[in-house]
Amino acid sequence: MRLIPLKDTAQVGKWAARHIVQRINAFKPTAERPFVLGLPTGGTPLEAYKHLIAMHKAGEVSFKHVVTFNMDEYVGLPQEHPESYHTFMYRNFFDHVDIPSENINLLNGNAPDVDAECRQYEAKIKSYGKINLFMGGVGIDGHIAFNEPASSLASRTRIKTLTEDTRIANSRFFGGDVSLVPKFALTVGVGTLLDAEEVMILVTGHAKAQALEAAVEGNINHMWTISCLQLHAKAVVVCDEPSTMELKVKTVKYFRELEAESVKSL
């Protein structure tokens, strides 16, 4: 595992965006051989999306031959709802870059048969071989995507019941009213994430410190699904200073020395 300890949220977003651009450009994608990118929603990746848009506008990257798969979507929330993840992605990223609409894959939380929707999503991912890079965030309780505590580490895309803690955390997007937050979501599984060639998780804020500790220094444990990163051959965790507060000083020092070159010019 790589741990990239940075100063603040702005640096986390910049490092993540720069890493994605480097990966896309090194891959040299074409229409026949696109780069497959997994994407999250929520507050954490917003800085990364801002930097990706800026780098695209500066001519440093094109998304013309990039195919995206999003992590999750609420069940029962209309697609046009301001807090649907469909709306979020277009508002904060897709509308500002040159990605063709046919290359965008989002789970349909209003599908008449959600189980079939999840199976088709998995099949479409497999049709591209694999996801080259999956970017994600983490919840206070250590969940990645909507793989809540006690999710199977072999799980695939499916419907999940959201915990009360997750709904309370997400109520900030619904005017603070928990009753407006959907109780169910479709989400890629832990196994789906582990199948990606590379997984990059962004961790920001002191509230995520316990989750980061579980990911880096804890045991592999389905109660902290982020700990599954320890099983991945190419996992990258990009974090800000407040989120490292539960890590041992020597752990942060070790990774800071290892990654000194990669964080230059941020």
Curated annotation (Swiss-Prot):
Location of the active site: D72 (proton acceptor), D141 (for ring-opening step), H143 (proton acceptor), E148 (for ring-opening step)
Gene Ontology MF terms: glucosamine-6-phosphate deaminase activity; identical protein binding
Site, as annotated: Part of the allosteric site: S151, R158, K160, T161, Y254
Pathway note: Amino-sugar metabolism; N-acetylneuraminate degradation; D-fructose 6-phosphate from N-acetylneuraminate: step 5/5
Pfam families recorded: Glucosamine_iso
Reactions listed under catalytic activity: alpha-D-glucosamine 6-phosphate + H2O = beta-D-fructose 6-phosphate + NH4(+)
Key words of the record: Allosteric enzyme, Carbohydrate metabolism, Hydrolase
Subunit-level organization: Homohexamer.
Function, as annotated: Catalyzes the reversible isomerization-deamination of glucosamine 6-phosphate (GlcN6P) to form fructose 6-phosphate (Fru6P) and ammonium ion.
Protein name, entry field: Glucosamine-6-phosphate deaminase
Organism of this sequence: Serratia proteamaculans (strain 568)
Lineage, top ranks: Bacteria, Pseudomonadati, Pseudomonadota, Gammaproteobacteria, Enterobacterales
